[in-house]
């Protein structure tokens, strides 16, 4: 059986993305996307997303809180120890394609 790990999200940025750089000077950003649930008990899920390199720079330059965003990526789980030595785990979407999901706002950037 083949394995498949593909995620497609359409939602809104929960806050402005911020560009950081790794120790090797690789651009990266993490942000949350608010996505409405389907079904009777509708609610909102906040999905953590990571973008690297050109995608990270693109998102930080042209997207801001509240903007609609379309994301394609894959789910990644990672573990680490926090400063107190506790084991921590995160599940996030690593984006490989990010696009605008609504027309340009007045006064917004032209891309």
Give the positions of each predicted feature.
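Single-stranded nucleic acid-binding surfaces, predominantly the OB-fold ssDNA-binding core
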Residues: 1-111
